[in-house]
């Protein structure tokens, strides 16, 4: 992996009003062509100036625009390509760090690096082709080693630093705001700048008291030539550091002094990190010494392109700070980073947005066509940037009114929660009512359908006569067919024209013309009725074509041809072919791709049919009345492609007027509900009219067409011959709120930007021109440095001198130049040694001070340790030291908590009552022993051991009472053997006497021997002989 050094530039500001009042002299000189900076020691004018070379050097007359175009532009351009970048300003307080990073809005040339980075990022985003970007911004500060979110609801809340194996170090709970334009980024920057901690010092009236980091996170999705997405992510950190301070110059006291101490500690940790990275022998880099160095861990020696802007003060009053800044910057040049493109990050939010957009578009595409969806999305007006900013950014929190703001947020949350609950409850109630209405409609539909079927069974009894006559004529056909010389008495010619019940997904079908009904019918006298047209009952169901029925009846004596033109519709399954035509006819039809062959019409005997009444007219009229009710019970669904099947029906043998109401009713109804009703009606007709055919069709029905279970809104539709049957098998679409889905889709698409100015040639040319300028400036700097090296090289040796004197003069000039360099090197070594000596003295003083503090703490510990209770765990300090451990993240020791172990000694004599020892151990348990009680017990124990007479003449009863006390019995055991004899005899008391012992009296009453002298004497006389001397 290729590595690159940290780029370092220096910028020297003009003198401010304070320095001019102090009549300070400039000590810094800058050579912009060679990127060199020199500083002269004001205390040693004879010494040569110290010279430093960087990647860029800018003096007082240079503006921020030039700095950005020459140095910062390539780094920010790399961020839009997937690299990580960091730009941070370093220097003492009042040196112009915030001016370099933030800048001034007027004049435009002095705008800071941060707002220029905004313009650059969105310029690259808008010019990109086939790439979408998700740009987010965050703003934080480090104040007194506490991380705060400058864009959060509570800017004073402390945030924690976490570390992830893939993301690295990050701030937990930091708010990220999606931005779409430069205006939104500037608004975020201004909001965070107002919340930043600033203070007044003698060197700067608006001194930054914290380090701030503005982060721009970019996620990009590029589409290659193959149409595959490539996801990359880049991050740009714009760091404005607080300046190092000297208390003698800033006059910081109190809170300002505490802030200055924290600032100097963090900057010192940053310097240590830089020194450790430059020194190749150092194995440990102290990133954890400060939160600033932890957040910049990836920027210093990691996967980041880094630019350091060292800000200088030209005044001689700040010579030491300026020299220290130059040394730090010169050291940072040698840091090597290893930047790489962040490809396919696992936690990319842009990938989640793209997947959600695809899902939402799929949902909307099911409800509307893609063209209408794209038109609807294109008509949407993007929201006003100001309104978007107000939604993205919280309002600044007023410090003195935090509680009121919290209360307002709480009330708003409760109001939203109540509104959501009310909406949910109303939706549930509406759903319940809708289910009740659907159930009622279905019940009404079932009742009416059952009533209609019952009426049809009664009305179709007349059709039985038609079936009987039809069978009789079929059986007599053989007799008439054998005699060819007999002319037909009646000829019936049927012309069947196919009709298609069209839906949105209906497949195209071929036209089928005249169909032969049967080849076995005999010729009959021709009857020609009057012509009529089948009119459509509804303009909406215009899929059935109008057909004309032409029938000629010249007279009862002369036969004529009867042509009937009626619609025959598609059938949905073979089930109905077998059901209506029989097994043989259905098999014949299915074998020829479900179409009947075109043949000449045959003459059909139709004697006796002209006088029959039409039983279908009344039925179809009732079906038409139910159309509106049935249409509400079924939800609309998309139709599937259907294959039309043309079949003849027994109703073709009826009068032409008999078929008209059926066609009209089928055309009037919506596609699904009427087919449900009409199929049931026609099936009952076929069952009744043709019992023989129906019985023959039962076997093939079970084998050919087994209906599959479908949802309640779609089922197998059975229809009579001559009508089209459609089977709906599509699943119902998910019920979604189209407006909510559309609003979410628009919101997600607005989050993603990119390619808005892809066709703008002027903007692209400007973008390329600025990139070329940065490359040319870098080449010029490299050439200037090479020329500088040649000046100090051996080019002089190539000259040819005309005389010895000319050569001596040239050699003298070269020697003077080398002597100046030698003198500068000696001064530099002396300065480094002096700095090292000062640091060594400082380190030794710190070590001595820490040793004195350690000795003080050790002496205090030796004095305090004997006072610690023995039942406390801190009485054993060695164990506490073994259990303690250092917390690297928080920077303090984790020590055990103090614990007091409550212990009580067991009772020595088990025959006495337990209430008295419990009372005595309670004081010890509480940790507060009664010192007066202890002294009184000690006095009693001494009197017992010294007063021989009292011990000798002591009664048994008193000794029994005293023996119940464990501590008193222990004191008697410690007495001399001769004096403990009276008490030792009490231990020989039989166990039977133990329950008869009296209750013990209070301890203090034992010393009063006056009331019990007589009793003691009597008992002593009785036991005098038994007691040993």
Curated annotation (Swiss-Prot):
ATP binds at residues 91-98. Homodimer. Interacts with APBA1 (via PDZ domain); the interaction is direct and is required for association of KIF17 with the cargo that is to be transported. Interacts with IFT B complex components IFT52 and IFT57. Interacts with IFT70B. Interacts with PIWIL1. Interacts with TBATA. Its main location: cytoplasm. It holds the Pfam family Kinesin. Dendrite-specific motor protein which, in association with the Apba1-containing complex (LIN-10-LIN-2-LIN-7 complex), transports vesicles containing N-methyl-D-aspartate (NMDA) receptor subunit NR2B along microtubules. Residues 5-335 form the Kinesin motor domain. This is Kinesin-like protein KIF17. It is found in: Cytoplasm, Cytoskeleton; Cell projection, Cilium; Cell projection, Dendrite. Belongs to the TRAFAC class myosin-kinesin ATPase superfamily. Kinesin family. GO terms for molecular function: ATP binding; ATP hydrolysis activity; microtubule binding; plus-end-directed microtubule motor activity. It comes from Homo sapiens. Keywords: ATP-binding, Cell projection, Coiled coil, Cytoplasm, Cytoskeleton, Microtubule, Motor protein, Nucleotide-binding, Protein transport, Transport. GO terms for biological process: anterograde dendritic transport of neurotransmitter receptor complex; cell projection organization; protein transport; vesicle-mediated transport. Residues 523-569, 647-673, 908-931, 968-1029 are annotated as: Disordered. Residues 346-462, 739-846 form a coiled coil. The keyword Coiled coil applies. PANTHER family: CHROMOSOME-ASSOCIATED KINESIN KIF4A-RELATED, KINESIN-LIKE PROTEIN. One of its GO terms (cellular component) is cilium. The keyword Transport applies. Residues 657-673 have a biased composition (Basic and acidic residues). Residues 532-551 have a biased composition (Low complexity).
């Amino acid at each position: 992996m290729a590595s690159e050094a940290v780029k370092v530039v220096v910028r020297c500001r003009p003198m401010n009003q304070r320095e001019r009042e102090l009549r300070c002299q400039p000590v810094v000189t800058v050579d912009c062509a060679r990127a060199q900076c020199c500083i002269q020691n004001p205390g040693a004018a004879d010494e040569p100036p110290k010279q430093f070379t960087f990647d860029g050097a800018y003096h007082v007359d240079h503006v921020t625009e030039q700095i950005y175009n020459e140095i910062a532009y390539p780094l920010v351009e790399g961020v839009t390509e997937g690299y990580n970048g960091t730009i941070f300003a370093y220097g003492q307080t009042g040196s112009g760090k915030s001016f370099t990073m933030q800048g001034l809005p007027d004049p435009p040339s002095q705008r800071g690096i941060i707002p220029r980075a905004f313009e650059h990022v969105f310029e690259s985003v808008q010019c990109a082709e086939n790439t979408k970007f998700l740009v987010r911004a965050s703003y934080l500060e480090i104040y007194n080693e506490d991380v705060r979110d400058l864009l959060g609801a509570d800017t004073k809340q402390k945030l924690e630093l976490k570390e992830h194996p893939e993301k690295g170090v990050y701030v937990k709970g930091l708010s990220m705001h999606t931005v779409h334009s430069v205006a939104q980024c500037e608004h975020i920057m201004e909001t965070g700048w107002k919340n930043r901690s600033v203070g007044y010092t003698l060197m700067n009236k608006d001194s930054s008291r914290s380090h701030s980091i503005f982060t721009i996170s970019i996620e990009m999705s590029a589409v290659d030539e193959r149409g595959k997405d490539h996801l990359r992510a880049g991050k740009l950190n714009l760091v404005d550091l607080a300046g190092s301070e000297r208390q003698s110059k800033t006059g910081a006291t109190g809170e300002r002094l505490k802030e200055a101490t924290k600032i100097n500690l963090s900057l010192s940790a940053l310097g240590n990190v830089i020194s450790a990275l430059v020194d190749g022998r150092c194995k440990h880099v102290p990133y954890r010494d400060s939160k600033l160095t932890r957040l910049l861990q990836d920027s210093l020696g990691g996967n980041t392109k880094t630019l350091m802007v060292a800000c200088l003060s030209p005044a001689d009053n700040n010579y030491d700070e300026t020299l220290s800044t130059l040394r730090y910057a010169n050291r940072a040049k040698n840091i090597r980073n290893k930047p790489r493109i962040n490809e396919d990050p696992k936690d990319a939010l842009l990938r989640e947005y793209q997947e959600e957009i695809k899902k939402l578009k799929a949902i909307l595409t099911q409800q509307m066509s893609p063209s209408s969806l794209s038109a609807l999305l294109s008509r949407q007006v993007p929201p006003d940037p100001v309104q978007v900013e107000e939604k993205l950014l919280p309002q600044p929190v007023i410090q003195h009114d935090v509680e009121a703001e919290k209360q307002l947020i709480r009330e708003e949350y409760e109001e939203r929660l109540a509104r959501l609950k009310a909406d949910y409850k109303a939706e549930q109630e509406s759903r319940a009512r809708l289910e009740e209405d659907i159930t009622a409609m279905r019940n009404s539909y079932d009742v009416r359908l059952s009533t209609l079927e019952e009426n049809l069974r009664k009305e179709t009894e007349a059709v039985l006569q038609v079936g009987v006559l039809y069978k009789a004529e079929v059986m007599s056909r053989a007799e008439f067919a054998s005699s060819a010389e007999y002319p037909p008495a009646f000829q019936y010619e049927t012309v069947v024209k196919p009709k298609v019940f069209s839906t949105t997904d209906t497949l195209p079908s071929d036209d089928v013309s005249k169909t032969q009904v049967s080849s076995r019918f005999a010729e009959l006298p021709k009857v020609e009725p009057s012509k009529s047209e089948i009119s459509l009952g509804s303009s909406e169901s215009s899929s059935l074509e109008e057909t004309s029925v032409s029938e000629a009846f010249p007279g009862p004596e002369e036969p004529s041809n009867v042509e009937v033109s009626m619609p025959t519709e598609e059938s949905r399954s073979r089930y109905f072919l077998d059901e209506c035509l029989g097994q043989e006819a259905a098999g014949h039809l299915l074998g020829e791709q479900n179409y009947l062959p075109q043949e000449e019409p045959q003459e059909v005997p139709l004697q006796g049919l002209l006088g029959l009444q039409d039983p279908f007219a009344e039925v179809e009229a009732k079906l038409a009345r139910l159309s509106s009710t049935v249409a509400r019970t079924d939800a609309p669904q998309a139709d599937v492609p259907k294959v039309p099947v043309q079949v003849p029906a027994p109703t073709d043998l009826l009068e032409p007027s008999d078929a008209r109401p059926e066609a009209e009713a089928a055309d009037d109804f919506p596609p699904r509900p009427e087919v449900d009703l009409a199929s049931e009606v026609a099936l009952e007709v076929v069952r009744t009219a043709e019992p023989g055919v129906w019985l023959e069709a039962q076997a093939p029905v079970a084998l050919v067409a087994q209906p599959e279970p479908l949802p309640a809104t779609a089922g197998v539709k059975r229809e009579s011959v001559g009508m089209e049957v459609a089977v709906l098998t599509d699943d119902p679409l998910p019920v979604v709120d189209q407006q909510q889905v559309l609003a979410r889709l628009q919101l997600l698409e607005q989050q993603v930007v990119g390619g808005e100015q892809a066709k703008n040639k002027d903007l692209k040319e400007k973008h390329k021109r600025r990139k070329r300028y940065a490359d040319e400036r870098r080449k010029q700097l490299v050439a200037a440095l090479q020329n500088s090296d040649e000046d100090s090289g051996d080019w002089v040796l190539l000259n040819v001198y005309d005389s010895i004197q000319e050569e001596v003069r040239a050699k003298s000039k070269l020697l003077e130049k080398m002597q100046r360099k030698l003198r500068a090197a000696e001064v530099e070594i002396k300065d480094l040694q002096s700095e090292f000596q000062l640091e060594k003295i400082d380190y030794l003083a710190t070590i001595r001070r820490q040793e004195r503090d350690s000795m003080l703490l050790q002496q205090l510990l030796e004095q305090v340790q004997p006072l610690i209770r023995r039942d406390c765990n801190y009485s054993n300090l060695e164990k506490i030291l073994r259990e303690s451990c250092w917390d690297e993240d928080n920077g303090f020791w984790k020590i055990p908590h103090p614990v007091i172990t409550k212990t009580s000694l067991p009772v020595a004599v088990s025959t006495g009552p337990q209430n008295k020892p419990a009372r005595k151990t309670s004081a010890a348990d509480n940790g507060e022993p009664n010192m007066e009680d202890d002294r009184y017990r000690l006095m009693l124990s001494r009197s017992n051991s010294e007063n021989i007479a009292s011990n000798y003449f002591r009664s048994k009863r008193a000794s029994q009472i005293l023996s119940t006390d464990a501590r008193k019995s222990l004191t008697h055991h410690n007495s001399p053997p001769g004096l403990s004899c009276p008490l030792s005899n009490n231990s020989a008391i039989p166990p039977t006497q133990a329950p008869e012992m009296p209750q013990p009296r209070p301890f203090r009453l034992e010393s009063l021997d006056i009331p019990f002298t007589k009793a003691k004497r009597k008992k002593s006389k009785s036991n005098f002989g038994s007691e040993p001397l």
